[in-house]
Amino acid sequence: MPTLLLSLGSNLGHRATTLATACDLLALALGDRGRISDCYESEPVGFVSEHRFLNCAARFECTLPLADVFARCRHIEKLLGRTQKSHNGHHTDRPIDIDLLAWGDTVLDSATLTLPHPRLPHQRRRPGLEAHAPQ
Protein backbone atom coordinates (compact mmCIF):
# COMPACT_ATOMS: atom_id res chain seq x y z
CA MET A 1 0.00 0.00 0.00
CA PRO A 2 1.63 3.29 -1.08
CA THR A 3 2.37 6.00 1.45
CA LEU A 4 0.92 9.35 0.44
CA LEU A 5 2.61 12.52 1.70
CA LEU A 6 0.70 15.79 1.49
CA SER A 7 1.51 19.38 2.36
CA LEU A 8 -1.41 21.60 3.36
CA GLY A 9 -1.41 25.37 3.69
CA SER A 10 -3.82 28.23 4.26
CA ASN A 11 -3.22 31.97 4.33
CA LEU A 12 -6.77 33.34 4.20
CA GLY A 13 -9.66 33.17 6.64
CA HIS A 14 -9.64 30.95 9.71
CA ARG A 15 -6.46 29.12 8.79
CA ALA A 16 -6.36 26.60 11.66
CA THR A 17 -10.01 25.65 11.22
CA THR A 18 -9.55 25.29 7.47
CA LEU A 19 -6.55 22.99 7.92
CA ALA A 20 -8.35 20.86 10.52
CA THR A 21 -11.39 20.55 8.26
CA ALA A 22 -9.20 19.65 5.28
CA CYS A 23 -7.47 16.92 7.30
CA ASP A 24 -10.84 15.50 8.42
CA LEU A 25 -12.13 15.51 4.83
CA LEU A 26 -8.94 13.87 3.58
CA ALA A 27 -9.29 11.10 6.17
CA LEU A 28 -12.84 10.42 4.95
CA ALA A 29 -11.94 10.67 1.27
CA LEU A 30 -8.83 8.48 1.51
CA GLY A 31 -10.13 5.89 3.96
CA ASP A 32 -7.32 6.36 6.47
CA ARG A 33 -7.10 8.58 9.55
CA GLY A 34 -3.51 9.33 8.64
CA ARG A 35 -0.84 11.09 10.64
CA ILE A 36 -0.92 14.88 10.77
CA SER A 37 2.03 17.04 11.75
CA ASP A 38 1.94 20.01 14.06
CA CYS A 39 1.12 23.28 12.31
CA TYR A 40 3.77 25.88 11.57
CA GLU A 41 3.77 29.34 9.98
CA SER A 42 5.66 30.32 6.86
CA GLU A 43 6.01 33.14 4.39
CA PRO A 44 4.37 32.72 0.97
CA VAL A 45 6.60 31.04 -1.62
CA GLY A 46 6.61 32.43 -5.15
CA PHE A 47 4.59 35.57 -4.42
CA VAL A 48 4.41 38.51 -2.02
CA SER A 49 1.55 38.79 0.46
CA GLU A 50 0.90 40.32 3.86
CA HIS A 51 -0.78 37.02 4.84
CA ARG A 52 1.45 34.30 6.32
CA PHE A 53 0.64 30.66 5.71
CA LEU A 54 -0.31 28.17 8.37
CA ASN A 55 0.91 24.76 7.20
CA CYS A 56 0.92 21.12 8.15
CA ALA A 57 1.90 17.84 6.55
CA ALA A 58 -0.11 14.65 6.37
CA ARG A 59 0.79 11.03 5.77
CA PHE A 60 -1.78 8.46 4.64
CA GLU A 61 -1.67 4.79 3.69
CA CYS A 62 -3.98 4.60 0.72
CA THR A 63 -5.19 1.94 -1.72
CA LEU A 64 -6.94 4.33 -4.10
CA PRO A 65 -5.49 4.93 -7.57
CA LEU A 66 -3.32 8.04 -7.78
CA ALA A 67 -5.75 9.76 -10.18
CA ASP A 68 -8.54 9.35 -7.61
CA VAL A 69 -6.37 10.72 -4.81
CA PHE A 70 -5.46 13.74 -6.94
CA ALA A 71 -9.12 14.37 -7.86
CA ARG A 72 -10.26 14.04 -4.23
CA CYS A 73 -7.62 16.53 -3.07
CA ARG A 74 -8.74 19.05 -5.73
CA HIS A 75 -12.39 18.48 -4.73
CA ILE A 76 -11.59 19.19 -1.06
CA GLU A 77 -9.79 22.38 -2.07
CA LYS A 78 -12.91 23.50 -3.94
CA LEU A 79 -15.19 22.59 -1.02
CA LEU A 80 -13.06 24.81 1.22
CA GLY A 81 -13.14 27.81 -1.09
CA ARG A 82 -10.21 27.32 -3.47
CA THR A 83 -11.16 28.66 -6.88
CA GLN A 84 -7.96 28.19 -8.89
CA LYS A 85 -4.41 26.89 -8.51
CA SER A 86 -2.95 30.16 -9.79
CA HIS A 87 -3.97 33.39 -11.48
CA ASN A 88 -2.37 33.91 -14.90
CA GLY A 89 0.38 31.49 -13.92
CA HIS A 90 1.15 33.28 -10.64
CA HIS A 91 0.43 32.02 -7.14
CA THR A 92 -2.00 34.05 -5.04
CA ASP A 93 -3.45 34.06 -1.53
CA ARG A 94 -5.73 31.07 -0.91
CA PRO A 95 -7.92 29.59 1.78
CA ILE A 96 -6.45 26.10 1.20
CA ASP A 97 -3.64 24.50 -0.78
CA ILE A 98 -3.13 20.74 -0.83
CA ASP A 99 0.06 19.56 -2.54
CA LEU A 100 0.87 15.92 -3.22
CA LEU A 101 4.50 15.58 -2.17
CA ALA A 102 5.05 11.87 -2.71
CA TRP A 103 3.16 8.67 -3.53
CA GLY A 104 5.31 5.75 -2.43
CA ASP A 105 8.25 5.42 -4.83
CA THR A 106 6.33 6.84 -7.79
CA VAL A 107 8.21 9.16 -10.13
CA LEU A 108 5.91 11.15 -12.41
CA ASP A 109 6.25 14.33 -14.46
CA SER A 110 3.00 15.23 -16.20
CA ALA A 111 1.25 18.47 -17.10
CA THR A 112 -0.81 18.30 -13.89
CA LEU A 113 1.39 16.50 -11.36
CA THR A 114 5.07 16.01 -10.57
CA LEU A 115 6.10 13.34 -8.06
CA PRO A 116 8.01 13.54 -5.94
CA HIS A 117 7.08 17.20 -5.58
CA PRO A 118 9.97 19.51 -6.55
CA ARG A 119 9.84 21.12 -3.08
CA LEU A 120 9.90 17.81 -1.18
CA PRO A 121 13.55 18.09 -0.08
CA HIS A 122 12.79 21.60 1.25
CA GLN A 123 9.57 20.42 2.94
CA ARG A 124 11.38 17.63 4.81
CA ARG A 125 13.58 20.27 6.50
CA ARG A 126 10.57 22.13 7.89
CA PRO A 127 10.00 21.94 11.63
CA GLY A 128 7.01 19.94 12.78
CA LEU A 129 6.81 17.57 9.83
CA GLU A 130 6.80 14.45 11.96
CA ALA A 131 4.09 13.10 9.67
CA HIS A 132 6.95 12.25 7.30
CA ALA A 133 8.71 10.07 9.86
CA PRO A 134 8.42 6.31 9.47
CA GLN A 135 5.85 4.67 11.71
Where are these regions (language model features)?
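N-terminal beta1-alpha1 ligand-phosphate binding loop
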Residues: 1-30, 36-41
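Flexible, gly/pro- and Lys/Arg-enriched active-site loops
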Residues: 34, 45-53, 64-135
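Solvent-exposed residues in well-ordered beta-strands and their adjoining turns
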Residues: 9, 61-63
